[in-house]
């Protein structure tokens, strides 16, 4: 039985709980069709917009004496539960409609990072809402946040994005899979923790979910990693008149595109880097990058970027 890790992008999940649920209902049909065809899948997801909104809302409440401030790791855990719940519901309903008897479980997942990771001094991971330059400057002045322009869509807050070292709950994930459970894990790249003297402590950061997904896929010896985002292909010259979607490309070709500066930091670059990390560990595997809405067409080979060695 072929194994596939499917990583859903947080930006591709819509801008509200209802929009997210509607998108997940559609996506669940494609995911369950994979199960129906005999594939074993594990699902991960991003949380950039969601964790940023949760953090912003709780901070607003705290500033107005309506509750305590919440640390970022706890906000990450809330986003795993919120997104995971909607995924579970959508997948359970679709599995039932297809007559497939399968449990679905969301596992709150911690991922170990290094306390001396250079990312803590160089925040790059966009989270939360898009703002104008004026709004971003105001937040920077008032709260000390760091903002970057995000692919022509506006300005977003950025936080540290350290490299994932190990998945704390990996054994539990493998046990659930062995028992035939459909597992949703490593949401938002996992809750980042550091380990000192055998004690785990959460840190303020967001791990790139694609890199954690690549790590998970490698550990599970998956045949394919599917990265779902907001666009149908990986593009070169993105946003320009001569932009071009890539169809099937080799690892060497993708490395050249990276060296040419084709992919934006905090956007497509980490997805491509994650793809290459997985293919380095699993040389016979493949990575498919496409849109959440277009997964069905991508599985039929009509759209998407397929990367192989």
UniProtKB/Swiss-Prot annotation:
Enzyme Commission number(s) from the entry: 2.7.2.2
Gene Ontology annotations for the cellular component aspect, listed alphabetically: cytosol
Subcellular location: Cytoplasm
Substrates-to-products reaction catalysed: hydrogencarbonate + NH4(+) + ATP = carbamoyl phosphate + ADP + H2O + H(+)
Transmembrane segments: none
Key words of the record: Arginine metabolism, ATP-binding, Cytoplasm, Kinase, Nucleotide-binding, Transferase
Taxonomic source organism: Staphylococcus epidermidis (strain ATCC 12228 / FDA PCI 1200)
Protein family (similarity comment): Belongs to the carbamate kinase family.
Organism lineage: Bacteria, Bacillati, Bacillota, Bacilli, Bacillales
GO molecular function: ATP binding; carbamate kinase activity
Designated name of the protein: Carbamate kinase 2
Keyword Transcription regulation found: no
Pathways per UniProt: Metabolic intermediate metabolism; carbamoyl phosphate degradation; CO(2) and NH(3) from carbamoyl phosphate: step 1/1
GO BP of this protein: arginine deiminase pathway
């Amino acid at each position: 039985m072929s194994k596939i890790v499917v990583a859903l992008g947080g930006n591709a999940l819509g801008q509200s709980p209802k929009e997210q649920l509607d998108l997940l209902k559609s996506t669940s049909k494609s995911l369950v069709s994979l199960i129906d065809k005999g594939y074993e899948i594990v699902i991960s997801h991003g949380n950039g917009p969601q964790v940023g909104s949760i953090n912003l809302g709780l901070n607003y409440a705290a500033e107005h004496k309506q509750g305590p401030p919440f640390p970022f790791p706890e906000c990450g855990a809330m986003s795993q539960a919120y997104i995971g719940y909607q995924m579970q519901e959508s997948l359970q309903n679709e599995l039932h409609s297809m007559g497939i008897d399968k449990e679905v479980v969301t596992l709150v997942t911690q991922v170990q990072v290094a306390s001396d990771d250079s990312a803590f001094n160089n925040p790059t991971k966009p989270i939360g809402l898009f703002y104008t330059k004026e709004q971003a400057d105001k937040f920077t002045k008032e709260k000390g946040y760091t903002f970057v322009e995000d692919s022509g869509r506006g300005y977003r807050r950025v936080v540290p994005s350290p490299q994932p070292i190990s998945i704390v709950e990996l054994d539990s994930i493998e046990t659930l899979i062995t028992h035939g459970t459909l597992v949703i894990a490593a949401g938002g790249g996992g809750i980042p923790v550091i380990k000192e003297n055998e004690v785990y402590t959460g840190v303020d950061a967001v791990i790139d979910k694609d890199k954690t997904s690549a790590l998970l896929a490698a550990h599970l010896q998956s045949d394919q990693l599917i990265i779902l985002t907001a666009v149908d292909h990986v593009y070169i010259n993105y946003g320009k008149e001569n932009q071009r979607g890539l169809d099937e490309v080799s690892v060497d070709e993708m490395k050249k595109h990276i060296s040419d500066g084709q992919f934006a930091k905090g956007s497509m670059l980490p997805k491509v880097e994650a793809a290459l990390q997985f293919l380095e560990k699993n040389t016979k595997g493949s990575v498919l990058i496409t849109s959440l809405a277009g997964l069905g067409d991508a599985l039929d080979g009509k759209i998407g970027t397929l990367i192989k060695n």
